[in-house]
Amino acid sequence: MKLCGFEAGLDKPFFLIAGPCVIESEQMALDTAGELKAITAELGIPFIYKSSFDKANRSSGKSFRGLGMEKGLEILATVKREIGVPVLTDIHEIDEIKPVAAVVDVLQTPAFLCRQTDFIRACAQSGKPVNIKKGQFLAPHDMKNVIDKARDAAREAGLPDDVFMACERGVSFGYNNLVSDMRSLAIMRETGAPVVFDATHSVQLPGGQGTSSGGQREFVPVLSRAAVATGVAGLFMETHPDPSKAMSDGPNAVPLSRMKELLAVLKELDTLVKRAGFLEDNFGWPACA
């Protein structure tokens, strides 16, 4: 898959989607994007900057949602222009697709909306690549139906049908908890779409703090190493200069100061795993009858 000027796939080095959960200010967006660009350029990792203009599914109605679409898109356009990186943001309603697609390079669909057929189809007909997040309630093999919906819609509109990614972000495990089943990453390859692992939302504790979500960022390195060892096309990570002051998802955000050391390890592991060239067919091992 061609994505933002680079090739994405299981036989290619992993790419990174990263940035703060929500846009807090233009200056922080510029500073964070600049730092991430420098880190990924040094390590040779393709990079897409991510941040949200609206967090439409906050635990509490009183929580900070963002700066709004108009201001948020203005800031993302500034990041794209001044820092020189592709940008991604999520949309939540069909009406948002057209104005957002006019600014960003990649669209992202929220996990909760992966079964909303009209929404997925509309995103697919935007003409932009789309990172489709798997719902916390969805079996990994069910993502094939979601990707197929997107591809059908793109073809109907006369658009490329190979611009969709399938993103794993954990699965509900009882109340206020998520777990990551690494088999999901291999199963989701059956969609034919590049598979992305969301290493930070996978350690989220949804609603775990009553009026906000908790998180266990100490497990981000553990799960990201496991995902890269399993084999992925891309990684998604939210990061913040000071997670304790983040306005959304601070408990599961990676401190910006720790990103370089983590990515360096993941880069080495990715190179080692993909060197063998056996990931796509699981080393040729047959499935049990």
Swiss-Prot record:
Protein's pathway: Carbohydrate biosynthesis; 3-deoxy-D-manno-octulosonate biosynthesis; 3-deoxy-D-manno-octulosonate from D-ribulose 5-phosphate: step 2/3; Bacterial outer membrane biogenesis; lipopolysaccharide biosynthesis
EC nos: 2.5.1.55
GO MF annotation list: 3-deoxy-8-phosphooctulonate synthase activity
Source superkingdom: Bacteria
Enzyme class of the recorded protein, top EC level: transferase
Cytoplasm among keywords: yes
SUPFAM superfamilies found in the cross-reference section: Aldolase (SSF51569)
Catalytic activity line of the entry: D-arabinose 5-phosphate + phosphoenolpyruvate + H2O = 3-deoxy-alpha-D-manno-2-octulosonate-8-phosphate + phosphate
UniProt subcellular location: Cytoplasm
This protein's GO CC annotations: cytoplasm
Keywords: Cytoplasm, Lipopolysaccharide biosynthesis, Transferase
GO biological process: keto-3-deoxy-D-manno-octulosonic acid biosynthetic process
Keyword ATP-binding part of the UniProt annotation: no
Alphabetized InterPro entries for the sequence: Aldolase_TIM (IPR013785), DAHP1/KDSA (IPR006218), KDO8P_synthase (IPR006269)
Family: Belongs to the KdsA family.
Protein name: 2-dehydro-3-deoxyphosphooctonate aldolase
Chain's gene name: kdsA
